[in-house]
Amino acid sequence: MEPLILTAAITGAETTRADQPNLPITPEEQAKEAKACFEAGARVIHLHIREDDGRPSQRLDRFQEAISAIREVVPEIIIQISTGGAVGESFDKRLAPLALKPEMATLNAGTLNFGDDIFINHPADIIRLAEAFKQYNVVPEVEVYESGMVDAVARLIKKGIITQNPLHIQFVLGVPGGMSGKPKNLMYMMEHLKEEIPTATWAVAGIGRWHIPTSLIAMVTGGHIRCGFEDNIFYHKGVIAESNAQLVARLARIAKEIGRPLATPEQAREILALNK
């Protein structure tokens, strides 16, 4: 089984300080949190940005400020920017940060109900985004929220629109309106991915109460794991986590106890095909 890659989604676009008082918002706070997460075992930072008042943002100069701040304190970590933005963000603003040419960024594979909103990813926009990844030479992580999106991604590969190989898939399970994080759902998604895109690597982000069940399954079946305040603000039920690093450290400890090594930065880049 290959080494485990832990990703820390430290801020997100929907979580607020009212939900999680320890949420990092400014570039300086994000850099401090990224360093702590790296030291706890994370090798990827999934990055959304905020304005100082907490509003979600896709401003290029703000992204660059956050990226530079993180690079200054932890140059080894992989920074994966979000092209999802906040629900309702214009597609042009979502796409724009690819011009910064990060190592990695997210590509959402379809539309779904997202709580009380609709997270719109029109097929034409998905194709446009996939072409932008190639234009800027950015490695995609494809975000999949239900099984039909695996089929949609497989079709894009067959058409030559997505060419990254191996392709990294992130199962995002437990979003209200999407597939839940029940173990049988994750097991099915794993099998379905193997059938449709056999060379793909995968990770899981279990939202809220599904964080631990999905993480444990991934840990023992060869998948990788995302954690952090974007997905889950609690350490235990009803107990607010002290930091993103606390969530990373728990997964790192469990991995050590079951004998699955954590990936080094070099191994993570190799697994995610960032060196190709």
Swiss-Prot record:
Keyword Zinc (UniProt): yes
Q: What cofactors are annotated for this protein?
A: Zn(2+)
Q: Which InterPro entries does the record match to this protein?
A: Aldolase_TIM, BKACE
Pfam families registered for this protein in UniProt: BKACE
**A biological-process GO annotation:** L-lysine catabolic process to acetate
Q: Out of the domains of life, which is the source?
A: Bacteria
Sites where the protein binds (5S)-5-amino-3-oxohexanoate: 14, 82, 85, 106, 108
Q: Give the function comment from the record.
A: Involved in the anaerobic fermentation of lysine. Catalyzes the reversible reaction between 3-keto-5-aminohexanoate (KAH) and acetyl-CoA to form 3-aminobutyryl-CoA and acetoacetate. The reaction involves the deprotonation of KAH, the nucleophilic addition onto acetyl-CoA and the intramolecular transfer of the CoA moiety.
Q: Which family does it belong to?
A: Belongs to the BKACE family. Kce subfamily.
Q: What is this protein called?
A: 3-keto-5-aminohexanoate cleavage enzyme
| Source species of the chain | Cloacimonas acidaminovorans (strain Evry)
